[in-house]
């Protein structure tokens, strides 16, 4: 990994990742107490920045799996991102 490597959570399915060599990710941060509305907390010291979705060449970057997040955290990340792209529904 290069010095510029940063942790990220993969949103895309492994079949997409394998076929394309790309992965759709959200970066992680340690700045969880900033009050950013689109940061999903993973634990006391880290969060996922759900409004910074990126497509990366994981093969070219030699990305490696470092860990996993709970399914509930992944679902919350996707829900948080979807608020940016889907129209609000009236209750």
Where are the regions a protein language model picked out?
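Conserved functional hotspots at enzyme active or ligand-binding sites that engage polyanionic ligands
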Residues: 1-91
């Amino acid at each position: 990994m290069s010095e510029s490597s940063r942790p990220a959570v993969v949103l895309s399915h492994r079949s997409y990742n394998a076929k394309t060599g790309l992965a759709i990710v959200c970066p992680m941060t340690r700045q969880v107490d900033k009050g950013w509305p689109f940061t999903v907390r993973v634990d006391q010291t880290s969060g996922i920045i759900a409004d910074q979705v990126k497509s990366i060449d994981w093969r070219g970057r030699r990305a490696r799996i470092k860990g996993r997040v709970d399914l509930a955290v992944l679902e919350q990340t996707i829900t948080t991102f979807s608020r940016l792209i889907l129209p609000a529904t009236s209750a």
